[in-house]
A protein has these predicted regions:
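A short alpha->loop->secondary-structure connector
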Residues: 1, 51-54, 77, 131-136
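Class I S-adenosyl-L-methionine
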Residues: 1-60
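Active-site donor-binding loop signature of nucleotide-sugar glycosyltransferases
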Residues: 7-9, 90-91, 144
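Class I SAM-dependent methyltransferase SAM-binding "motif I" and its flanking Rossmann-like core
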Residues: 36-109, 151-154
């Protein structure tokens, strides 16, 4: 059978030691992360360790919570001729944000914005977003996406903090902002009879 260990109570050094021990014994190791490991994960230092010790590894892509949010909201996050950019970011909490990536600067584009790890600083998030998004911009607070107790709360940007606080939403909440939420307008040119492409000319 498999040996299963939770990394929640382990330091990075303890994780490395355990993985190397099993690797040196010729055993197969799976380091399982939530979501997709390339987004707000901790795989960079793990890859550096594997590289340093010549350990072969393979990364299997996962499904990020922002993708689960789009599915739960039954929304396409890019809308033809209206929104063509999705921003994945977070508010500034204990880990400082680079100056050029402050939330209010990113908000200038009024793109679809998916905000991770920021329910605890929702007042600050709302304040920064409202510097550029209209107060009535659609928002969604998506709690425990893909879990059995998943909950979705829709509203307007001006009520975002109220929505999060009144429903006691925690760190595992994805905040989505933008006109793409619930949008049913705009047609893709992909299937237009006037549009020629590789498979139809």
């Amino acid at each position: 059978g498999a040996t299963v260990r939770s990394s929640a109570d382990m330091t990075l050094e303890e994780q490395f030691a355990l993985m190397k021990e099993f690797y040196d014994r010729g055993l197969f190791i799976v380091r399982l992360h939530t979501g997709d490991p390339c987004i707000y994960g901790a795989i960079q230092e793990q890859m550096a360790f594997f590289d340093e010790y010549g350990m072969d590894y393979h990364i299997t892509p996962g499904i990020s919570s922002f993708l689960a949010a789009a599915a739960a909201l039954q929304s396409q996050f890019t809308i033809p001729e209206k929104v063509q950019t999705i921003i994945l970011t977070r508010g500034e909490g204990r880990t400082p944000m680079p100056e050029k990536e402050k939330l209010h600067l990113l908000a200038r584009s009024q793109s679809t914005m998916c905000i991770f790890l920021s329910a605890s600083i929702v007042d600050q998030v709302q304040s920064e977003l409202m510097q550029h998004y209209p107060p009535t911009t659609p928002v969604a607070a998506c709690y425990h996406l893909t879990w059995k107790d998943e909950r979705i709360y829709r509203g307007e940007l001006q009520d975002l903090a109220k929505i999060v606080k009144e429903n006691n939403l925690t760190l595992t909440t994805m905040i989505v902002v933008g006109d793409a939420i619930d949008n049913r307008q705009g047609l893709s040119k992909l299937y237009s009879h006037q549009f020629k492409h590789l498979f139809r000319n």
